[in-house]
From Swiss-Prot:
Subunit field text: Forms an icosahedral capsid composed of 60 subunits, arranged as a dodecamer of pentamers.
GO molecular function: 6,7-dimethyl-8-ribityllumazine synthase activity
Residues making up the signal peptide according to the UniProt record: none
Active site: 89 (proton donor)
Binding-site positions, (2S)-2-hydroxy-3-oxobutyl phosphate: 86-87, 128
InterPro entries named among the record's database cross-references: LS, LS/RS, LS/RS_sf
Protein name, entry field: 6,7-dimethyl-8-ribityllumazine synthase
Amino acid sequence: MIRHIEGSLQAGEHRFALLVSRFNSFITQQLEQGAIDALRRHGAKEEQLHVVHVPGAYEMPLIAQKLARSGNYDAVLCLGAVIRGGTPHFDYVAAEVSKGVAQVSMDTGVPVIFGVLTTDSIEQAIERAGTKAGNKGFDAAMTALEMVQLLRQI
């Protein structure tokens, strides 16, 4: 018989760190609220959620690593917005943040969720922070819930 393993979407007693970029705060505040909403809807209590603000997305991997290694959190959600401008800065930041977040997760075994918007325009970021395209902070929280439960079963 084939065994199927799936993560449930219940917070249980798990603890979550939300790492939120202050840069583009008009977007990241919405991502933060979306993530908190998702976690609370799925049973997380306020004392299970800790929000840490960092200057920008580029600083996320280091702080995510510190949080993941602390043993205090079952998952770390990285929430930010990198919006393309007229210089190659976007490409460097987006690449390094995504690589760094993935590396922290692999090195620590703690789910570190990439909830960083990488968009070509402010309009696209606004759409993904709670308007037309849903709220990617909410989606990141759902991924965190599922990953935490999935890891418990493997």
